[in-house]
C-alpha cells in the first residue's frame, strides 16, 4: 500500500499469491550404486544400518541428479518430507523437497523411552553406526535444520518417549538450538540431555574413529548388485 505523492491517495499493490506445489518425491533411480558408494565409502555409515533404512524405503537414490533422498513418513505410512543430499563431494548440495512438512522429517520410531534429535540424516546414521547395540529399539529424528518440529511430532505420536537427547552440531548454531529446545522440554517436565560430538558433527566423529578408512573398497564391503538390489526390488 503506497501513498501517491502529497495528495494522500492510497494505491493498493496487487496481492501476489505464490503457487502451491504439492509434495512429490523425486523419481527413483533403478540402481543405487552412487548412493551406497557415497554413504558407505565416503561417509562411513555402517552397512547393516543403511540397508535397514533402504529396506524400509526411507533412503534411496534419485534418478535425476543421483542425490541421496531421505524420506519422512507420517503415522499412516504416507511420505510427508524428503531431504536431498548430493553424492558428489565436490558439489555438496543439500535441500528439502518443495512442500515438505518439517514435523515429519527423516525419523525412526522405536519402542524404548529414548529419542535422539540430530540436525542432518547423515549425522543420525553416523551416531547409530557408532552405537549399534539395540539401536532399533530407540527413536531418532533429523530435523534437516535446527528446528524442533520433528521432535515434538514424535513426542505426540510416540507416548513411550520419556528421555530426549539433543545431538545438534558442535558449533554456535547447533548449541544455541540445543539450549533453546532444552528450555522448552524443561518447562514440559521432559527429561533431556545435550550430547555434543567431539568434532564438528557426528559424521566427523565417525570418520575420525576410522570408519572411513581410505583403504576400504566396494569389494571389501561386498557391494555387489545382487546384494544391494535395485530400487524396483525394494
Q: Residue locations for each model-derived region?
A:
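Basic, glycine-enriched DNA-binding surface that flanks or lies within the catalytic cores of DNA
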Residues: 4, 8-102, 106
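Conserved aromatic-histidine-acidic binding/catalytic patches
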Residues: 27, 113-115, 169
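Generic non-transmembrane alpha-helix signal with a bias for helix starts/N-cap capping motifs
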Residues: 32-33, 120, 178
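Short glycine-/small-residue-rich flexible loop motifs, especially phosphate/cofactor-binding loops
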Residues: 36-37, 124, 182
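Phosphate-handling DNA/RNA-contact segment within nucleic-acid enzymes
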Residues: 63-157
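TOPRIM fold recognition
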Residues: 129-234
Amino acid at each position: 500500500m503506497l501513498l501517491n505523492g502529497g495528495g494522500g491517495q492510497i494505491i493498493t499493490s496487487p496481492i501476489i499469491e505464490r503457487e502451491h506445489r504439492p509434495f512429490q518425491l523425486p523419481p527413483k533411480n533403478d540402481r543405487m550404486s552412487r548412493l551406497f558408494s557415497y554413504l558407505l565409502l565416503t561417509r562411513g555409515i555402517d552397512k547393516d544400518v543403511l540397508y535397514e533404512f533402504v529396506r524400509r524405503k526411507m533412503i534411496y537414490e534419485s534418478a535425476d541428479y543421483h542425490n541421496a533422498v531421505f524420506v519422512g513418513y507420517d503415522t499412516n505410512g504416507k511420505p510427508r518430507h524428503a531431504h536431498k543430499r548430493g553424492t558428489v563431494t565436490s558439489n555438496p548440495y543439500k535441500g528439502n523437497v518443495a512442500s515438505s512438512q518439517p514435523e515429519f522429517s527423516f525419523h525412526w520410531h522405536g519402542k524404548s523411552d529414548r529419542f535422539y534429535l540430530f540436525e542432518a540424516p547423515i549425522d543420525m546414521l553416523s551416531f547409530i553406526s557408532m552405537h549399534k547395540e539395540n539401536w532399533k529399539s530407540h527413536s531418532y529424528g533429523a530435523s534437516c535444520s535446527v528446528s524442533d518440529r520433528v521432535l515434538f511430532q514424535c513426542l505426540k505420536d510416540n507416548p513411550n518417549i520419556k528421555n530426549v537427547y539433543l545431538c545438534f552440531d558442535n558449533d554456535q548454531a547447533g548449541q544455541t538450538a540445543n539450549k533453546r529446545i532444552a528450555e522448552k522440554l524443561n518447562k514440559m517436565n521432559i527429561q533431556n540431555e545435550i550430547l555434543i560430538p567431539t568434532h564438528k558433527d557426528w559424521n566427523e566423529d565417525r570418520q575420525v574413529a576410522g570408519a572411513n578408512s581410505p583403504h576400504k573398497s566396494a569389494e571389501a564391503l561386498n557391494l555387489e548388485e545382487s546384494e544391494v538390489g535395485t530400487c524396483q526390488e525394494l
